[in-house]
Amino acid sequence: MMLIECPNCGPRNENEFKYGGEAHVAYPEDPNALSDKEWSRYLFYRGNKKGIFAERWVHSGGCRKWFNALRDTVSYEFKAVYRAGEARPQLDSTEGGTR
C-alpha cells in the first residue's frame, strides 16, 4: 500500500485516488482553428519522461478535488503535492518524497 498526500485531506490510501494525466497542459486558444493532426497531438501526445513528472490526480474517494503532484516515474515516489491553480514547486532531484 502506498500513501498519497492529498493537499486538502492529508495522507490517504492510494486506492482513494485516480490518475488524471500530465499537469500544466495548456488548452489551445482556438481549438476550432487546429487541424485534425494538431488536435490529435493536443489530445493524445504527452511526455513520458523518466524522473520527476508533474501529474494531475483527483481524490475520488475523499474530498473529490483535483490537485497536482510531482512524482518520480522511476521510483513512484511523490516528491510534492500542490493544489490545482498553484505554481509548480521547484525541487532538486533529492528533495521531498513520500512512499
UniProtKB/Swiss-Prot annotation:
Entries under InterPro entries matching the protein: SoxD, SoxD_sf
Binding-site residues, Zn(2+): 6, 9, 59, 63
GO function term, MF aspect, one: sarcosine oxidase activity
A GO cellular component entry from the record: cytoplasm
UniProt subcellular location: Cytoplasm
Chief place where the protein resides: cytoplasm
Oxidoreductase among keywords: yes
Keyword Oxidoreductase: yes
Pfam families, alphabetized: SoxD
pH curve summary: Optimum pH is 7.7 in potassium phosphate buffer and 8.0-8.5 in glycylglycine buffer.
Temperature dependence: Optimum temperature is 37 degrees Celsius.
Catalytic activity: sarcosine + (6S)-5,6,7,8-tetrahydrofolate + O2 = (6R)-5,10-methylene-5,6,7,8-tetrahydrofolate + glycine + H2O2; sarcosine + O2 + H2O = formaldehyde + glycine + H2O2
Signal peptide: none
Keywords: Cytoplasm, Metal-binding, Oxidoreductase, Zinc
GO BP field: tetrahydrofolate metabolic process
Top-level taxon of origin: Bacteria
EC number(s) from the headed UniProt entry: 1.5.3.24
Complex and partners: Heterotetramer composed of subunits alpha (SoxA), beta (SoxB), gamma (SoxG) and delta (SoxD).
Family: Belongs to the SoxD family.
The protein, known as: Sarcosine oxidase subunit delta
Protein source organism: Corynebacterium sp. (strain U-96)
Taxonomic lineage of the native organism: Bacteria, Bacillati, Actinomycetota, Actinomycetes, Mycobacteriales
Name of the encoding gene: soxD
